[in-house]
Amino acid sequence: MATAKKELSADTQVTVLHQDAEHTVYRLDGTDGEVVQTVYPVFPGIEIAYHDVHATACAMQRTRASGCLEIHHCREGRIAYPYGGACFFLAPGDLAIVQRSAAAAPAHFPTGHYHGITVSIDPARAPDCLSCFLEDVEVRPSALIEKFCADAACFVTRSSQGVAHIFSELYSVPEGIRKGYFKVKILELLLFLSAFPMQAAQPQHSYPQSQVQLAEQVGAYLLENTERR
């Protein structure tokens, strides 16, 4: 049963469907379909969100807070995410890293559905260094932001063996070990990213928004006029 609502934008409201000590389930209303996010806090300022989307467009952020580091992984479907005047695309297995903007535009889902994960790190609330959780994990959120998001850049890479290993296990975590397992996997992910080669970025996954909008308009026109010759 829905327990609370708050406005995300003029067109989107966030409804809390379920909440307990370990996770919160949100429904994002105001879309042309169904969008559900299941969010688990892992460490102070660090959370993991599972997205189950059956819609063509939706605002993915539940708050207007800016500055957070977001690590997006696509498991199924497609996502087109506007960012910095451009738009990046993720297909199954792809990974993107961005720094959240308070004025982010809604994401689009060309196939009408999307399933994936976002790991969010709020540098204002997260520890300066994650070695406080596990010795020798010398990873600083500020250093990851500088590495992947310098000059408002968006880092996108195709699936690799390392990325697939980390995220495939996050989609099938037994409930009984979920809380501790998330902590281990998030530390593994961030340590992995701290050593990730920047040359693995895929700049061709990003396109100007004007080009994306034109392609969407052409696609919509063709769908509306399929019987015309």
Model-derived segments and spans:
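Short, well-structured alpha-helical interface segments that form or flank functional binding sites
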Residues: 46, 66-69, 177, 181-184, ...
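N-terminal positioning helix adjacent to the helix-turn-helix/winged-helix DNA-binding module
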Residues: 162, 207-218
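Conserved strand-loop elements at the edges of beta-sheets that form or border functional pockets
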Residues: 42, 184, 225
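Basic, amphipathic alpha-helical hairpins
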Residues: 167-181, 190-203, 217-229
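A short, N-terminal "cap"/entry segment at the start of jelly-roll beta-barrel domains
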Residues: 1-41
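Amphipathic alpha-helical segments enriched in hydrophobic/aromatic residues interleaved with Lys/Arg
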Residues: 136-185
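N-terminal regulatory/effector-sensing and dimerization cores
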Residues: 26-141
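Short, well-ordered coil↔helix boundary/capping segments
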Residues: 157, 209-212, 229
